[in-house]
Amino acid sequence: MSENKCPMHHSAGGTTNRDWWPKQLRLDILHQHSSLSNPMGDDFNYAEAFKSLDLAAVKQDLLALMTDSQDWWPADFGHYGPLFIRMAWHSAGTYRTGDGRGGAGSGNQRFAPLNSWPDNVSLDKARRLIWPIKQKYGNKISWADLIILTGNVALESMGFKTLGFAGGRVDIWEPEADIYWGAEDKWLDDKRYSGERDLEDPLAAVQMGLIYVNPEGPNGDPDPFAAAVDIRETFARMAMNDEETVALIAGGHTFGKTHGAGDAALVGPEPEAASIEQQGLGWKSSYKSGKGGDAISSGLEVTWTSTPTQWSNNFFENLFGYEWELTKSPAGAHQWIPKNGAGKGVIPDAHDASKRHVPAMLTTDLALIFDPDYEKISRRLFENPDEFAEIFAKAWYKLTHRDMGPCTRYLGPEVPAEEFLWQDPIPAVDHPLVDEQDVTDLKLKIIGSGLTISEVVSTAWASASTYRGSDMRGGANGARIRLAPQKDWPVNQPEQLAKVLKVLESIQSEFNKSGKKISLADLIVLAGCVGIDQAARNAGVEVTIPFTPGRMDATQAQTDVESFAVLEPVADGFRNYHPTQFSVSAEELLVDRAQLLTLTAPEMTVLIGGLRVLDTNADQSKTGVLTARPEFLTNDFFVNLLDMGTTWKPTSKAEDRFEGVDRVSGQPKWTASRVDLIFGSNSQLRALAEVYASSDAQLRFIDDFIAAWTKVMNLDRFDLR
């Protein structure tokens, strides 16, 4: 058959909608990871499957693998441990605090772009090495869990005592479309910087395709002082302080080596660009054998210690024990060796017992002694190796578990008993939960409290909508909305919030005197449900709003103010809160927040319509409140938005505020934001708005709003799943 008669032209990649309209709103990020791409089926429960796993047997198999060197990819120093530590580190190390995305929690290293990042050269081989073990234990252990467990076993096999391991990471089955890795279109480019050295939010790596920093120094400039600046910024953006940063770098570089045996130009394309016969592997090298002593990954050729497969203090011993001078690897990369020929014969060769080498360091290693603050920490850990081991163990555990959410999600026999502040602890339920009659009595108290529908709904939404599905932080459980920093966030209307909380705390105190107890976290959510119930009744519809007690109240001591500060919304389209003009549009920020709330496009749409008519704007303005009867749960927002009797015009230079006027008389009718108008402008969102604007849609609208509301209220109720 000739090519022009082929019935499958789409396989060649035709022009897409985004090719025609690059600024088209990305709603596809709201519909990822569905049952359509997941082979496991809706009835598969990974937590239950993991509980049936013989973890000790898996670890024993991994331990045997560590020294079972394969001809197709020989182990450095006869031990795969350092390679597997790098695999686990680079899986977890993509996490960033800004939006909670990245990290080890989904097994995303198997997919583009991470599987093909320049910083992940040869990790395709690491995953193939553990495939027989994944194959053996099947669905009882996810790739995400196995990758981190392998890193732990690697450390243990080389004499290090880890803090523990928790399972519970659920695999995804397609690349993540929601994560913004940067605007660059070339590997290792750094358009993400502006000004002096201001890194774009929420990014936490210095260049496209790197996990953290350039090991040669900023943009390849071998300046340890400048490297320290980058290290401090990037590690802080993944929740590590200076002490943890030093311990992680020194601990990780106690093991193994880097690979730069020859010219990096001889390395072939990454896995996503490699030929089909390579079967998902990439970076095929034509330099000599391309493996073992001929391997090329970063282009650096560094072995830090004389004990590369054994935990020791030798990294610090060498770092402080020599004066260093700049040199280049065989691949031409900047690295450092001892001055005046010192250190000859100290370092073993990774594949030839007859060869010896000098110690070598990266520019980023030297930053640990050039930067004054890092130097103090490095010297202390050098002089106190037991403290070094303890800090590294805790930092490694944090690194590999930071994106798993609360400890209640942790699975397995190796979960540490200690709970850490970075895990956002919440006390366990210590009292009988309220029953149906108690809930009825409390509802009557709330109704009679004088609080408005808008006030209680706004407060419940503010409490629950901090949740991020990316790292499972935030949410209504813990009632942290009453604590710093959340109580002072402008988006939460601190004055109104204080008023509502005072009333609810009074109701709670009175109820708890009866011998039964309800947490403020539960009461805040219940009050929101009462508000919706009243609003539906105002609209002539009797409804039952699901409410499940079981939340508890965290204390200020259990709340890291700095850590929680990153959860503050810079914008919240659900509350029409847009205090700052960004290069990203308000509607894009809305979709991003909806994705973090794990909402679909229909759920996002119905929530916007409901929250608007319930009058919940953060500034108490009437922007987007497209109804003459606020606090009535009606579909008025959609009806009036799609009314062809209204025309819209911008009222601000930035075109982020609009006025709707009568098409005939020109009389003002409404005001709206970009977030409001996008539901009439975007074709996909308009299609959804039309469903809810139809004359027969009122009951559907209320039912769908209640379902989406309940979902948000329970996002952090992992005990209900």
Curated annotation (Swiss-Prot):
Uppermost EC category: oxidoreductase
Modification after translation (UniProt): Formation of the three residue Trp-Tyr-Met cross-link is important for the catalase, but not the peroxidase activity of the enzyme.
Residues carrying the site annotation Transition state stabilizer: R86
Pfam family, one: peroxidase
Residues binding heme b, per UniProt: H253
Cofactor(s) this protein requires: heme b
Purpose: Bifunctional enzyme with both catalase and broad-spectrum peroxidase activity.
Record's subunit section: Homodimer or homotetramer.
Protein name: Catalase-peroxidase
Gene source species: Shewanella baltica (strain OS155 / ATCC BAA-1091)
